[in-house]
Amino acid sequence: MLFTIEQLELIKKLQHTGMSSDQLLKAFGELEVPEQLQNNNTIAAALYSPLLVQHLTTPKSETPVKLTVQTVPTPVKSEPQSSNCSSPFEHPICSNAPRPIRSQRTPMKEITTLDDPNELEEFMKQGEEACILDMKTFITQYSLRQTTVAMMTGVSQPYISKLLNGNHRELSLRCRKNIYCWYLNCRRHPNKLAAFLADPTTRLETNGDGELIPQRRERYVFRPILIRMLESFFTQTPFPDLPRRVEIANACNHVLKMDKKGVGLMPKEVVSPQVVSNWFANKRKELRRRSAEASAASTSSASSSASSTANHDSVSVSSMSPRDEETSSRNTTPETAISPSPAVSTFEVSRPSAIISATSSTTSPISIPATIIPSVSPSALELFAMAQQLGVQLPVPFPTLPTHFFPFQMAPFYGNPASILKSE
């Protein structure tokens, strides 16, 4: 038969008082007598506020000492019982009252026993994955610890963790049903959970209707000296294991005691390994966020500079006129490809003999404005255009034709040269 550490300590204390095994059996029998009484208030008080044997602290003697057990009822504020709840454990118990001596591996029958056994079957019909999800939401909403659930259900904490993580196949069906019954009972009767809660840091409360009030976990406030210490530890080991976290927590508590000049630390000031783990996780998350922001900023700056350069080039190209483009293309052409004729401001044009009057035997020079004269060698079409502006007809020979003249009449051409050239 296996015993817990607490049970072994109690057995040793009882042995030190000089009690025999028969006296122990008789004492346990006397403790079971109040459970058979009909007075519910007396039963609840006897279970919740038992007095230890008065000879536990007396020195060991050779003669057997008579065992006396005395139970004193604790003042309890009674509430009217509901129609569907007749258990004496329905009454809320004062938080400062002594709690019963109970093995941590023994399930609480009053919490794991349902009023209606069919309720468990109806609950499990939706599938165990959905059952675990509902129970996990309930535990997270009310900030319950896995150790508290393990103590109430009689299942060890690692198996509670496996169940909540979805590895329910590693637990026996009996253990799973026991946990499900605990969840259904606490969900239906929140005052049971508030009364039997053994973890003082959770501090569950109920409202006027007997429903649980969700509690927010208290945030740990780090002092500057702790932040400096944790920063130094983070540079050494960003991912500390459990022994390392325990070492860091002990070092932080030691520094806090020195900072308070030997004054004891309050419960909310004590640094636990879980607090260290949370701080390291938040620190790693902050570093990842900063790195992501820096990379995003560098990428956006590079893209903006590239887009501004492209816009500048497009503006420079679009600002050039067709004449500028032609001039720039001509300027980029080698000099050997173009043989411009020297610029002249005046030249003589001879009129045809048929058009010139008989009295005038010579032609007079004509002055052409400088704006009409192109800067490069003009083409034949440009020459005809200038001649039209000046009112002069030019019988220019066309070397590719046999007659060496243009194949159309000159008079219509000077009137509308575009239509003539288009028709031809």
From Swiss-Prot:
- What keywords sit in the KW lines? DNA-binding, Homeobox, Nucleus, Repressor, Transcription, Transcription regulation
Residue intervals of the HNF-p1 domain: 1-30
Briefly state the protein's biological role. Transcriptional repressor which maintains cell fate asymmetry of AWC neurons in adults by repressing the expression of multiple AWC (OFF) genes, including srsx-3 in the AWC (ON) neuron.
Query: What subcellular compartments does it reside in?
Result: Nucleus
One example of a Gene Ontology biological process annotation: positive regulation of DNA-templated transcription
Q: Where is this region: Disordered?
A: 291-345
What is the protein name stated in its UniProt record?
Answer: Homeobox-containing protein 1
> Which tissues is this protein detected in according to the database?
Expressed in both AWC neurons. Also expressed in the FLP mechanosensory neurons.
Give the record's family classification: Belongs to the HMBOX1 homeobox family.
* Gene Ontology molecular function: double-stranded telomeric DNA binding
Note the CDD domains from the entry. homeodomain
Q: Which InterPro entries match?
A: HD, HMBOX1, HNF-1_N, HNF-1_POU, HNF_P1, Homeodomain-like_sf, Lambda_DNA-bd_dom_sf
Naming one, the record's GO cellular component terms include: nucleus
Task: Enumerate composition-biased segments (Polar residues).
Answer: 311-321, 329-345
| Biased composition regions of type Low complexity, renumbered to the chain | 293-310
Q: Which residues form the POU-specific atypical domain?
A: 103-199
Give the superkingdom in one word. Answer: Eukaryota
